[in-house]
Amino acid sequence: MGQCRSANAEDAQEFSDVERAIETLIKNFHKYSVAGKKETLTPAELRDLVTQQLPHLMPSNCGLEEKIANLGNCNDSKLEFGSFWELIGEAAKSVKMERPVTRS
């Protein structure tokens, strides 16, 4: 995959719904990565992000601690965006569509 360009306000109109959703995920990842590098989250930062931003898709009683412990390379207690993306994929699996979305 190619590199993603950063969007500014005027470009946002051109983005599809999915592109805006991905941009929102990236912004939230960086918003919660306060300790150390912006490219990684500590397990505590990831826990905060998930409990505050995904309370309905991934409630705290769903084995969140185990999922965080099993993500990526936890040797240095830093999780990269790919690990966050993996967790988002797990949360997305719980979403059930009532009916297929039709394209217009």
Swiss-Prot record:
Q: Which GO terms describe its molecular function?
A: chemokine receptor binding
What InterPro entries does the entry give?
EF-hand-dom_pair, S100_Ca-bd_sub
Q: Which SUPFAM superfamilies match?
A: EF-hand (SSF47473)
Presence of keyword Repeat: yes
Q: Which organism is it from?
A: Mus musculus (Mouse)
Q: Where is it mostly found?
A: cytoplasm
Q: Domain named EF-hand: which ranges?
A: 27-61
Assembly behavior: Homodimer. Interacts with AGER.
Q: Which UniProt keywords apply?
A: Apoptosis, Cytoplasm, Repeat
Per the entry, what this protein does is: Modulates P53/TP53 protein levels, and thereby plays a role in the regulation of cell survival and apoptosis. Depending on the context, it can promote cell proliferation or apoptosis. Plays a role in the regulation of cell migration by modulating the levels of MMP2, a matrix protease that is under transcriptional control of P53/TP53. Does not bind calcium.
A Gene Ontology BP annotation from the UniProt entry: defense response to bacterium
Where, subcellularly, is it found?
Answer: Cytoplasm
Name recorded for this polypeptide: Protein S100-A14
The GO cellular component terms are: perinuclear region of cytoplasm
